[in-house]
Amino acid sequence: MKLLYELDEKVSKDDLPDIYCDMDMVLCDFMKGADKAVGEPFIYADRETRWKKISNTKGFWEGLDWYPGGKRLYSFIAKYDPHILSAYSTKDANSRRGKLKWLAKNTKVPRGKTHLVLREDKQKYAVNRDGSSNILIDDYIKNINEFNAKGGIGIHHTDTGKTLRELKNLGFK
């Protein structure tokens, strides 16, 4: 299968794969918000304690800041009617509703293109019913590897410039 960036002809918007974009640490800064809510670095806090503190922080999810470069990335992909594909937390009953509120406040992604799933289910969005591949932009390499293994095109998000270059190489302008 030829990749879009290998084609010499001009690629139309309709020929491009659908974009599925993660939220946490791609668009919004979960770690910054979590560190503040927990009162210490999230990764060092006791697992049960940290999630209890997040659950008890009113407006935690919808109050997250943009991740550095997140607005720039969203502005670029917004032209292509992206989907949001984000894992909800099974440890915080507020995460689904809060993520939806964050998206409504900060983006124009319609509810029908927002998929809040268990982390391990992201790979189910790798290909469409017709077999065409989708793109996943995600900071977690395990998600990228699983998505690629199912026939998708994973972009491991480590910084916005790199992600935008990879999208442009795939034909997005």
Regions found by a protein language model. Give the residues of each.
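Active-site neighborhood of HAD-like aspartate-dependent phosphohydrolases
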Residues: 8-58, 159
